[in-house]
Amino acid sequence: MSKQNRGRLIVIEGLDRSGKSTQCQLLVDKLISQHEKAELFKFPDRTTAIGKKIDDYLKESVQLNDQVIHLLFSANRWETIQYIYEQINKGVTCILDRYAFSGIAFSAAKGLDWEWCKSPDRGLPRPDLVIFLNVDPRIAATRGQYGEERYEKIEMQEKVLKNFQRLQKEFREEGLEFITLDASSSLEDVHSQIVDLVSNVNIHETLDVL
């Protein structure tokens, strides 16, 4: 399939309560309003058997060791990826609310080895564009429903932020378009910036892999 016909793979990352999920939905709605084919994928996908186990963990209903939950997060991405490939090949732009970068950033924040955290996701498709919504963890902590899940603690989020900054540096050196936006701007302004970035992204004929 030519690069003109395949869909784009767009990832939006961010700290918890950064407005990421809202922006993902706004982007999908915008693309559809422009008569483009678009679909939203949220990770973790809490509807699968693996995703339900992750959901229990995040809500602190069960305890799992850090290596186990990291591998479950990765498996949750792998179990969906074939369908994502199929959609992209049909010309559907796939918008991902979190991806492998979150897995690395959060697990490394708990002290797991950096390269080990990256290894389970090697072979997943490399996005055409990654957008990181940057917000001060202390501001995110003031937003509604903050603290309902395991990782929503300021100290943890500060470590995750540093890891995202490291990921951006590493992957940009590998040629990945990895852009940071200030998520403290208005919802409309952030949305407008995201739409501009997505509209102008350069795509290769086929997706590379991580």
Swiss-Prot record:
Transmembrane feature ranges: none
GO cellular component: cytoplasm; cytosol; nucleus
PROSITE patterns with a match to the protein in the record: THYMIDYLATE_KINASE (PS01331)
Name of the gene: tmp1
Protein name per UniProt: Thymidylate kinase
Binding-site list for ATP: 14-21
EC number(s) recorded for this UniProt protein: 2.7.4.9
Highest taxon of source: Eukaryota
CDD domains xref list: TMPK (cd01672)
Gene Ontology terms, MF aspect: ATP binding; dTMP kinase activity; nucleoside diphosphate kinase activity; UMP/dUMP kinase activity
Annotated catalysed reactions: dTMP + ATP = dTDP + ADP
The keyword Transmembrane is assigned to this record: no
Function: Catalyzes the conversion of dTMP to dTDP.
Pathway per the UniProt entry: Pyrimidine metabolism; dTTP biosynthesis
Source species: Schizosaccharomyces pombe (strain 972 / ATCC 24843)
Any single biological process term in GO: dTDP biosynthetic process
Keywords linked to the UniProt accession: ATP-binding, Kinase, Nucleotide biosynthesis, Nucleotide-binding, Transferase
